A protein has these predicted regions:
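Auxiliary Fe-S-binding modules of radical SAM enzymes
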Residues: 1-119, 125, 133, 180-191, ...
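Short linear Ser/Thr-Pro motifs
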Residues: 88-90, 140-141, 257, 285
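Short beta-strand motif preference
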Residues: 98, 121, 137-139, 282-284
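Residue-level structural signal for beta-strand termini and adjacent loop
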Residues: 123-124, 233
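Canonical Radical SAM [4Fe-4S] cluster-binding loop centered on the CxxxCxxC motif
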Residues: 125-181, 185, 195
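Surface-exposed acidic, glycine/proline-enriched linker/cap segments
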Residues: 172, 192-204
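Conserved AdoMet/S-adenosylmethionine-binding subsite of the radical SAM
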Residues: 180-183, 200-394, 398
């Protein structure tokens, strides 16, 4: 799992639960108890980060630590500035991608880029069964990604650094208290959204294209990065997002998507077994059901082959009527054959299918077919509708529940697998080449 950066050593209120914040106030000799808890609730209710006792230094010589949130130090709460927005349309409404700037990690080779790097998040409209629109917020857990999936834009960047829990929660904070608040006519939010930027008129126009009556109802960890490569910060961020004094999102409305890091799955499963975490959503990016094909497009498979991944999924704690989601990015000429449809069905069916190589029980899972969204310089096109329909029909015929993910935001590089900029990869390579000794 990724090493912890120095930016995690002193947390901010955005990266703490209410009880952790109250403990920090008490340790610092600040107003604690009910006063601190009410202050915490007010921050997440109003979006105001300028109140008293939101940042203070430790009175002791002990070094503050994220692992000990009761330490008496809090960094100033800062929500990363939104630098750009991109708008596209879908049948359910406007899709808005926003880019925030965060500090680069000290000593990183990306020093040539300046003091900041960028993360991307997407506000995605969803129409429920009753016709009510809500928004799903797709958040990033890292800047770039180390997993190397060949079909993914973010993977082409390489890993720049992981995000802290506060930076992850900050994406939700920016979406709710800046973008959506500006959509509803909040002048202070509009000022935060466009502060000092020449594109201010365009950004306001984008924000106002959203539905002012809609709220963020779901959060998916499907943006930049591999969540289980940063699992402790992701777990902490979920703890904050579900805190009843904070954002108060039901844990059942949060989904973590992973390429299948077996060690990270085991760590997350231990937390899901605890009360209050039982209904956390899990999505596994499988994309091929044989080791040869999956290893070609997903290097993680060389470390954790399909059999190991499936064994860990059999151990995943599932409560009530919940199920996990098997994600399958359908790539023309790579994993779209009839045999591929049968193989991914057998991965779910396990020993209940006579043709399955997996003897274990049937997974409590559905297959989510995702038509490939081409990255920059992609060697593959998007699949045709006919190909998607044929592939899904073959899975359905095997008795496995299958759904298609509707494509949203492809034209603005906001769809699944399209987040990130290759400029970072190019400049990182240039920096490495400049530092390498010449023959």
């Amino acid at each position: 799992m990724s090493e912890r950066s120095d930016i995690f050593l002193t947390p901010s209120i955005l990266g703490l639960t209410a009880r952790q914040y109250e403990a920090a106030c008490k340790a610092a000799g600040r107003s604690a108890g009910r006063v601190a808890l009410d202050r915490y609730a007010a921050v997440f209710r109003s979006g105001d980060l300028t109140g008293p006792d939101l940042a203070f230094a430790s009175p002791s010589s002990a070094s503050p630590s994220f692992a000990s949130p009761s330490s008496a130090s809090l960094a100033p709460p800062v929500v990363a500035s939104i630098r750009r927005t991109h708008l596209s349309q879908s049948p359910e409404g406007a899709v808005l991608k926003f880019t925030q700037s965060v500090p680069r990690r000290a000593g990183d080779a990306l020093a040539v880029l300046g003091d900041e790097v960028e993360i991307e998040s997407v506000i995605i409209p969803m129409i429920g069964r009753r016709g009510v629109r809500t928004y799903t917020l797709c958040v990033s857990s890292q800047v770039g990604c180390a997993m190397g999936c060949t079909f993914c834009q973010t993977a082409q960047m390489g890993l720049i650094r992981s995000l802290s829990a506060a930076e992850i929660v900050g994406q939700f904070f920016a979406a709710r208290h800046t973008v959506l608040a500006a959509c509803r006519g909040d002048e202070r939010a509009a000022a935060r959204l466009t502060a000092g930027l020449p594109e201010r008129a365009v950004m306001l126009e984008h924000a106002r294209a959203l539905d002012p009556a809609a709220e963020i109802g779901n959060i998916v960890f499907m943006g930049m990065g591999e969540p289980l490569d940063n699992v402790e910060q992701v777990i902490q961020a979920i703890s904050v997002l579900t805190d009843h004094r904070g954002p108060c999102l039901p844990v059942s409305r949060i989904t973590v998507s992973t390429v299948g890091r077996v060690d990270g799955l085991a760590r997350l499963a231990a937390r899901v077994a605890e009360p209050g975490w039982h209904r956390l959503g899990l999505a596994i990016s499988v994309n091929a059901a044989d080791d040869a094909t999956r290893g070609t497009i997903m290097p993680i498979n060389r470390r954790y082959p399909m059999a190991d991944l499936r064994t860990q999924l059999e151990r995943w704690p599932i409560f009530g009527g919940a199920h996990m989601c098997i994600e399958y990015v359908l790539i023309p000429g790579v994993n779209d054959r009839d045999d591929d449809a049968r193989a991914i069905s057998d991965f779910v069916l396990g020993g209940t299918s006579p043709t399955s190589p997996y003897p274990g029980p049937m997974l409590r899972a559905m297959i989510n077919v995702i038509p490939y969204n081409p990255r920059e310089n992609s060697p593959w096109p998007a699949p045709t509708q006919e190909t998607v329909d044929r592939f899904m029909a073959l899975i359905k015929a095997r008795g496995v529940f299958v759904k298609r993910r509707r494509t949203k935001g492809r034209d603005t590089m906001a769809a699944c697998g399209q987040l990130g900029s290759l400029a970072y990869a190019r400049k990182k390579r240039s920096a490495a080449e400049a530092e390498s000794p010449r023959a």
